[in-house]
Each structure stands twice: as C-alpha cells, then as structure tokens.
C-alpha cells in the first residue's frame, strides 16, 4: 500500500511530497486533490487506480436511489458484475456501509469517501450526503483514473443555494432546469422559487392556482430538483393585499395544497417590499404560525417554513417599533427568518448585539438568520452585467446563519459565476478563496474560452453609481497602471511607455475576447445573454486603442494623423451610443454599460486631455466632451439621494427603485438641469393614490425662486403639461410632518431641445 498523508483543509495549502511504495495495479501520483466545494478533510495519496469498467455494487436496495442512478451513470454501468472493484454505497446504518459508520461525519449532509485498489466507499450521514459523495467521486475521475484517497466532508452552512427573487424577466423553464443540475453538482441544496414578476406568486393572483402549462412546469422542476438533491422551495408573496381574516388564511392554505399536489414539499412566505396593512409583525407571525401548525406539521414530509420579513435589513428596521422583536418572540421557533444585512445590498459580518451584523439580528429574532445575499442581482442596475468574484462576507460566521442563498441576475447563465462562488463559500467558509472560486467557475461555465471569458468578466464586475451605494472591484490589476498613466499625462503631458504598451495590450485583448466569445457555440444561452455587452466591450477596447494612438499622434506632431483618429473616436462614441439605445431596453435602467469603473474613466480623461492639448497647440476648437450627465439630483431622503439620474434623448429621469421608499416629513428631491429649457410633460408615479394630500411639485428658472405647480392624478399616475414654460429645476416636497411610504416608479422630466 502507498503511504497516505492526512491533509486537513483547516490547516490549508501545505506543500508536500509523499513517499510512495510501488505495487501492482497502482500508478505513481503526486498531485493535490482539487474538489469543488473544498472538502473539510482529505487524505492525500500518491497513487491512482484505473477504472476497469466492472463493479460489484453493494447497497443498491437501501441507498438514496438518485445517488445510485448518478453513480451508475457516472461509471457507465447498469448492473453489478461478479468481479471488479467493490463499491459500497449507502447511508449511516445501512448494511452495506455499517462497518464504516465510525468514519461518517455526524453533520447533516456529511459523507465519507474512500478509494483504494480494492474498494470504493460512498457513505452518507443521510441521503443528501450519499449524493454528494457521488458528486465528489465524479470530480475525482480523470482520464479513467481515480486517486487513492479518503475524504471526510460536510457543509458548514445547513441550507445553501439560490433565491430567484429579483425584479425583471423571470428565468425560462429551461434555464431553471439547467440551474438545478448545476446546484446538485456544486452541492447546493436549496432553490427558492420567488420571481417577483410571476403573477401567481404575488398580488393580486397569489390566491389563484397556476394554469395547466405553468403547473406542469413546476411539477417538472420539483422532480428534477429531487434528482439533483435540491430542495425546491415555492414562495408566495401575499402581503400587498392580504386580509387578516379566516378567508385569506384558507386561501393561502388552499394554494399551498395545490402546490403540494404538484410535489412541492418546502414553502416560503415573503412580506418584503410592501406597505400598508400587510406589514404588521403580529399579524404576520399569527398567520405563519397558523400555516406551520395547520399545514407544515400536519403533512409530516414538509420542511420548516421560511419567511422574508418586511424589515429585512438593518437600515430599514425600526427597533423601537418592535417589528423584529415581535417576530423573534411570537414566531414559532422552527420558522426561518431571512435577512439581507445592514442594508438591502450588503455583505455579512459577525458584528455585535449593539451595532449590527449577524449577532445584532440574531439577538432580535432569537434564532440564526437565513441570509438572503443580494448579489449578483442587478435589478437596480440593469444596464450592467455583474460577473466578478464573490467576496466581502466574513469567513467565520457559518454558525451564525441557518442558511445562505444568493439572489442572482435575470441573466441565468451569467449568474453562474457568482453562484459557483457562493456554493464554495457556504460549504467551507474557513478556506474560501474568492479568486480561485471565480477562475474555477469560469473554467466550468465556458471551458473552451475560459481565458476570453475571464478577460470579459474582469471588466464587467462593478455596478456603477446606484441608489444602494454598493460597489465591486473591477479591472483591479489595471487600476494602478491607469492611475500612474493618468497622473503623468494629466500633470506632465507625458506618460511611461511601459504603461502605454500595457494599456494597449489590455484594449487589444478586450477586442479579441469579445470577438472570440461572440462566435462561441459551447454555451449558446450564455453568449446570447452577454451579446449586447460583448458588442459594447469590443467597442470600448477599440476606443481605448484609438485614444492612445491619439496621444501618440500629438506627441509625434502629426496633426493630420490626430484629426483622422479624432474622427474615428467620435464615430466609435456614436456607435456605443447606438448600441445603448436598442439593446436591453427595460423601463428602469435601459442600455448597455461595460468597463465603467477603471477603463472608461481612463479613456475619457486621456481623450479630453489630448484634445485640450491639440486645441492649445494648433489654436483649434475641437469638442473634448465624452458622454456625461450634465444634470444633478439632490435630496435629503436617504433612499433617494443616491439614485442615479439618466438621460434618454430629451427626457431626464430618476432611476426607479424596487423597494418601498420612506420619505420623511418635509423631505425634498430636487433635479437641476444644466441650463434653462422649455418644459414639456413631467410624469410621476409614486405607486400610491392621493399624492396631492402630502406632495408639492415646484419648478424654478434659476434654482432659487420656486413656483408651485398644480396637478391631478389618474390612479397612481401624475402628468403635468409643461406648456414650454422655462425651467431650470424641478422640486418635489413632502409638505407634511408625516413619513410617506412610496415607490419611485417614475419621475421623468421631458424638455424641448
């Protein structure tokens, strides 16, 4: 037998070389085992065995049937042979693996995997654990060889997965099926179905059963989830129009019964992003306890209920009002409570009971919070793709959470990079490596063009300015080079040649990567999602190269060459504008933004400086403008002050927000235009009737003297005809002392140009 070394990932990444004895049937082997997610403990071996194709299965009659099916598919073996490698598979207590009980970890979903020249043991602490043992075995097979090893493994976080809880276009049925398989392969056990734009999930149709087509699809999702060891959780969002009476209790239970008939065995109730009567904590607790006692506990095979509270983050919590403490004391202890962190979009940290973090919320709700992590969700920055690494959450807080689920983008395939990282993080936080997980995800999602996808994802990670103030690193390796180049060029009219060459290489690689990805056929769904951003990404690379060439033409004193490049740059800017107009035209943040954190500001500043130098040198008046936002928004309302302004032709609009905005008494929002314009319509939708009872609309020609504008409302919509009145600024004020709960669905100023 070869000498075997214990490699404990808690003392991670030790370099070693084991001494190996030679014997028949085994091959020399010296390589660290790489499994996703990283196991808790591995015995590294220095030998491999060859798979013969003949296997003696032990435990088929007792073990998880889905694990058995996955194993036979993996080994391409339909039945047990009379000779060959003996395979023992089963759960703790099964006859087939009873002699290995002492090796099986006692944690939920834990497993023990042993591979040697005589046997393969796949022993789970439960059925999930057995399935995960098979998934690990699948990753270990390389060119029909297996390493001689032992793995003892289990997850640190009990529930790990995805909540489809974003606003926007729900995923397609086929995308969900692909995702469920991906979750199983990466040991994620939870998929919460809660798309905000599913009419039968939310108001007003949550009381109605799904039509036949949709019901059939959900039934298939439930079955595929089971086959991949994923818990399909169906969520309902009744809070906006629920009545706290027996009729709606019965309506909710009837809907749950309908879902139960479709195979659903796990449920969630969401009370997020609502206002009015549905936000009362005592009523929510009463209803959820009723469901728990009359449905969950009665059914026996239904898992504990999950709820998303109305106050689901610290910044919106009114601790003195008692909402969270009411849930903590009145809600049955088996019910999970979801939490997004200190803000709507936030990373998780340990904290303390006084200031914030996981300890703060757990103290209030008297149980570990079930984390709803709002990344890479992009429903508030829909003109961006968020394809960067998963990072920012503390690495030693697994014991402070009951679950960790990621809320993804509406772009299902593009979300897989982050989902892969979350799978790795939630399984084994202590050794989580965000960069490794990100690069491994890229290789998994698009192996044939991993290099090109990494280039693209590197420059499509940040969110840009947004109402939540949440940002991500982007183009990180390029940032110091860009800063050094700009410092020299803006202050000394020169630049380091090595930085010039590195930037040129980067911009060239951007173009090449976009071209290669656009014709890739390995993952058509992914390429289709990325296509608008790939087009824009290539143009950005071209723009960068031409701007650098512009500086060189100026330095070489070739004005004709400068003008030729200037003309081309203007054409590229126009092309980027043209891409921004037809693609991704959602009503919230339409258009296509790429490489916005480091690269675009770098290109814009170089261009502006080069044109200014040219104008000075040749007494010219070339336009040095790049695209920019000439108008400004100011507000003392916390949830409004960071909302981006957007301009589409002659319309200036406030970027809509998905969540309820708490507009304090006497709070204002002011939009100041860059100059005086003839005013056309102003369109407003705050998602509530009778806005005139508290809201005052005013306009100004100078930003100092204000004139009140009367308006009328049709349902939730307000339109004021501007009649070409001169306007420089528009202001809206809550004139009362009372806080108003509104939605920023539309605030658009249209002017004549």
Please provide the spans of the model-predicted regions.
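Disordered, acidic Ser/Thr/Pro-rich linker "stalks" and the adjacent N-terminal cap
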Residues: 599, 605, 609-679, 685-695, ...
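Feature activates predominantly on carbohydrate-active enzymes
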Residues: 100, 105-255, 261-265, 297
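C-terminal functional modules
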Residues: 434-625
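Noncatalytic modules at the cell exterior or secretory-pathway interfaces
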Residues: 722-736
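Bacterial Sec-dependent N-terminal signal peptides
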Residues: 1-32
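Extracellular carbohydrate recognition and processing domains
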Residues: 704-723
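Acidic, contiguous N-terminal accessory segments
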Residues: 12, 30-117, 143-152
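Catalytic-core regions of glycoside hydrolase
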Residues: 265, 274-439
């Amino acid at each position: 037998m070869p000498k075997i070394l214990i490699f404990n990932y808690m003392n991670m990444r030790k370099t070693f070389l084991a001494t190996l004895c030679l014997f028949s049937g085994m091959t020399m082997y010296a390589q660290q085992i790489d499994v996703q997610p990283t196991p808790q403990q591995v015995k590294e071996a220095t030998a491999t065995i060859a798979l013969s194709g003949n296997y003696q299965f032990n435990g088929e009659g007792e073990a998880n049937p889905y694990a058995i099916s996955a194993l036979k598919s993996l080994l391409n073996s339909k039945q047990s042979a009379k000779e060959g490698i003996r395979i023992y598979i089963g759960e703790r207590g099964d006859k087939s693996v009873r002699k290995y009980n002492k090796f099986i970890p006692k944690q939920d979903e834990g497993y023990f995997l042993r591979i040697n020249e005589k046997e393969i043991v796949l022993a789970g602490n439960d059925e999930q654990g057995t399935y995960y043992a098979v998934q690990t075995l699948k990753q270990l097979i390389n060119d029909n060889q297996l390493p001689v090893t032992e793995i003892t493994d289990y997850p640190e976080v009990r529930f790990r997965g995805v909540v489809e809880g974003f606003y926007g276009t729900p995923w397609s049925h086929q995308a969900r099926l692909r995702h469920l398989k991906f979750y199983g392969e990466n040991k994620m056990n939870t998929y919460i179905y809660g798309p905000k734009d599913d009419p039968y999930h939310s108001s007003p149709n949550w009381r109605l059963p799904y039509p036949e087509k949709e019901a059939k699809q959900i039934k298939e999702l439930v079955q595929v989830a089971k086959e991949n060891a994923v818990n399909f959780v169906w969520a309902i969002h009744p809070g906006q129009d629920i009545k706290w009476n027996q009729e709606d209790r019965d309506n909710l239970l009837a809907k749950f019964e309908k879902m139960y008939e479709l195979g659903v065995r796990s449920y969630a109730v969401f009370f997020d992003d609502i206002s009015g009567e549905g936000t009362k904590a005592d009523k929510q607790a009463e209803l959820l306890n009723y469901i728990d006692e009359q449905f969950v506990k009665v059914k026996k095979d239904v898992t504990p209920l999950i709820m998303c509270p109305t106050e689901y983050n610290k910044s919106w919590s009114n601790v003195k009002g008692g909402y969270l403490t009411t849930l903590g004391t009145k809600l049955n202890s088996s019910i999970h409570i979801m939490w997004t962190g200190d803000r709507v979009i936030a990373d998780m940290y340990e904290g303390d009971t006084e200031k914030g973090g996981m300890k703060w919320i757990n103290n209030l709700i008297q149980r570990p919070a079930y984390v709803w992590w709002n990344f890479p969700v992009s429903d508030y920055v829909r003109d961006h793709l968020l394809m960067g690494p998963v990072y920012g959450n503390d690495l030693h807080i697994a014991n402070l959470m009951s679950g960790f689920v990621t809320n993804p983008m509406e772009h299902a395939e593009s979300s897989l990079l982050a989902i892969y990282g979350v799978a790795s993080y939630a399984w084994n936080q202590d050794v989580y490596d965000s960069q490794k997980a990100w690069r491994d995800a890229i290789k998994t999602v698009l192996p044939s063009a991993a290099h090109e996808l990494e280039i693209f994802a590197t420059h499509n990670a940040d969110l840009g300015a947004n109402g939540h103030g949440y940002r991500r690193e982007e183009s990180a390796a390029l940032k110091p080079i860009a800063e050094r180049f700009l410092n020299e060029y803006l202050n000394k009219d020169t630049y380091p040649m090595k930085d010039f060459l590195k930037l040129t290489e980067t911009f060239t690689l951007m173009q090449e990567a976009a071209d290669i990805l656009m014709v890739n056929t390995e993952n058509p769904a992914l390429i289709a999602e990325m296509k608008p951003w790939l087009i824009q990404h290539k143009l950005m690379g071209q723009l960068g190269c031409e701007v650098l060439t512009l500086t060189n033409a100026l330095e070489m004193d070739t004005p004709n060459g400068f003008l030729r490049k200037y003309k081309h740059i203007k054409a590229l800017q126009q092309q980027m504008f043209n891409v921004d107009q037809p693609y991704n035209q959602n009503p919230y943040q339409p258009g296509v933004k790429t490489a916005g954190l480091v690269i675009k500001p770098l290109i814009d500043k170089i261009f502006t400086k080069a044109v200014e130098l040219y104008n000075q040198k040749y007494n010219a008046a070339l336009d040095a403008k790049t695209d920019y936002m000439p108008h400004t928004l100011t507000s003392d309302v916390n949830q409004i002050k960071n909302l981006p302004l957007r301009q589409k032709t002659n319309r200036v609009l406030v970027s809509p927000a998905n969540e309820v905005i708490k507009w304090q008494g006497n709070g204002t929002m002011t939009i100041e235009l860059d100059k005086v314009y003839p005013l056309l319509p102003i369109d407003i939708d705050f998602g509530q009737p009778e806005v005139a009872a508290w809201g005052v609309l005013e306009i100004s020609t100078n930003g100092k003297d204000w004139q009140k504008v009367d308006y009328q409302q049709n349902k939730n919509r307000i339109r004021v005809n501007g009649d070409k009145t001169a306007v420089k600024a528009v202001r809206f004020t809550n004139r009362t002392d009372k806080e108003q709960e509104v939605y920023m669905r539309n605030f658009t100023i249209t002017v004549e140009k």
